[in-house]
Amino acid sequence: MSTNQETRGFQSEVKQLLQLMIHSLYSNKEIFLRELISNASDAADKLRFKALSAPELYEGDGDLKVRISFDAEKGTLTISDNGIGMTREQVIDHLGTIAKSGTKEFLAALGQEQAKDSQLIGQFGVGFYSAFIVADKVTVKTRAAGEPIDRAVLWESAGEGEYSVADIEKRERGTEITLHLREEEKEFANEWRVREIIGKYSDHIGLPVEILAKEYDEEGKETGIKWEKINKAQALWTRSKGEISDEEYKEFYKHLSHDFADPLLWTHNKVEGNQEYTSLLYVPSKAPWDLFNREHKHGLKLYVQRVFIMDDAEQFMPNYLRFMRGLIDSNDLPLNVSREILQDNKVTAALRKALTKRSLQMLEKLAKDDEEKYLQFWKEFGLVLKEGPSEDFANKENIAKLLRFASSKNDSSEQTVSLEDYVARMKEGQKAIYYITADSYIAAKNSPHLELFNKKDIEVLLLSDRIDEWMLSYLTEFDGKQLQPITKADLDLGDLADKEQEEQKEQDKTFSSFIERVKTLLGERVKDVRLTHRLTDTPAVVSTDNDQMTTQMAKLFAAAGQPVPEVKYTFELNPEHHLVKKVADFADEDEFANWIELLLEQAMLAERGSLENPTAFIKRVNNLLG
């Protein structure tokens, strides 16, 4: 008998997600059982953890398990566990809403085609809601550990916008989920179909999964039914690597992460000695949609002596490796460990150092052994890895080896060139690694600063991600070579400089009065005016000194709402260009001023991508064209 019944509406995001999920995951519908068994396993883990300090929560039943039964006539499938259970408030919070930050924005941004992508929807960890793929009604009965028998909860919904919740009596602790299968999904009320799915998806979890199976005598006659354990029920990471198949590793990843896609790669290690722990680390094949959300939960599952302690233990991985998934099972941490204790703990620090090293080694090996697969990783997680040099000084060189960039040598925006590739191709006498940062690949590729380098066939790395300038303020050298921006006024090409410099000096003398005239005109608006011989097709550029903030860094500061120091540019004019020669001969001061202003505005536009007064620029161009 139920009491205190009420009907409530789903949060709008839940309604939207249910519809998207039912349509996008239908072709892979059997995963609902994996999701529900995973949830049951998590509930058991949480009970074990709470019972460390409150053993009475076991209520005399510490034999944790998942049980699956079905009724072919009624067309129902029931998954029950004796784990932690839920209170009424938790039922409403967990089954009626999605608390994930950014959910509304994510769903709003989903296009019709994207909505059909099961991997995209699967990133959500849809868990419980996957039941509605095969059921037209779902009934949940649950009682939280430690709650009295009459404080259990009944939850029911047809998945169409509302659900009901009521108080009931339930003797057994834990959660029981009954799926009222759609007419066309009655195959899931079949013992052998259920056995097949569990063998495929859930054989590896550490909790016994039992099925209510028929018993037969020697003649094959049915004699009754009994609960039969049908999985190995041994935590996968505790088994030896040699006896675990790739398929088992992949399915365990999906159980662990609730991801629908296979992982890209993994590493499984057991360490003994000063520290004793087992780690199983995965690199996903796809980045989660909220990877750059500040509230994005990340980190490893933490076990101590095979007892689950917590999800999302971020203390074991640096932030730039937040895409890593997996678990660590330590023998050295106390069972009563908390997030606060983990924060300032020598064991945690040692484990973090070891796991970071292990992760970077795994990526380095992938880059060496399978370039195509590594570039697949880079497309998904390269931006995050670029945060590394600013966060992890100790591993800066190793992170640098993993970075990939676009290059002036490739006619493509694809980031495929490593710093090691670049160094191996450096010209004889070249002492620096040259790069340019810009708002986009196109802007970098067509920058006038590249003209001299193209002429001399010197490779330049083309950087256009917002984080690049920040990263390079920490990554200033590689393999003993300085990383040098080509946009600096005092660019030093060393032994690669023109041998005809003496001739240029003589030529420059003839323009000395012209330069003084430009300086007088522009005054304090520029830091300096000089001639340049690094341009071939462009009349003028602007550049910054080594001790000045670059244009891209200034933009980064401005975008972050930080105060930006004034950047004064050096105005460089190409004496070989016909326009500069023409302007140098103008006697009329107004005409001279108009053309110099135009050349400066053009140079500023090429450098910054915008002008403070574009209307004046357009007016000037129109006047000169007229």
Curated annotation (Swiss-Prot):
Binding partners and assembly = Homodimer.
Q: What does this protein do?
A: Molecular chaperone. Has ATPase activity.
Task: Provide the alphabetized UniProt keywords.
Answer: ATP-binding, Chaperone, Cytoplasm, Nucleotide-binding, Stress response
Segments carrying the region annotation (B) are 340-555
Gene Ontology CC entries for this record = cytoplasm
- What domain of life is recorded for the organism? Bacteria
Start and end residues of each stretch annotated as A: 1-339
Q: Where is this region: C?
A: 556-626
Q: Where is the protein found, in the record's own terms? A: Cytoplasm
Whether Membrane counts among this entry's keywords is no
The record's principal subcellular location, in a coarse class, is cytoplasm
- Protein family membership: Belongs to the heat shock protein 90 family.
Pfam families per record: HATPase_c_3, HSP90
Q: Which GO terms describe its molecular function?
A: ATP binding; ATP hydrolysis activity; ATP-dependent protein folding chaperone; unfolded protein binding
Coiled-coil intervals: none
Official protein name in the record: Chaperone protein HtpG
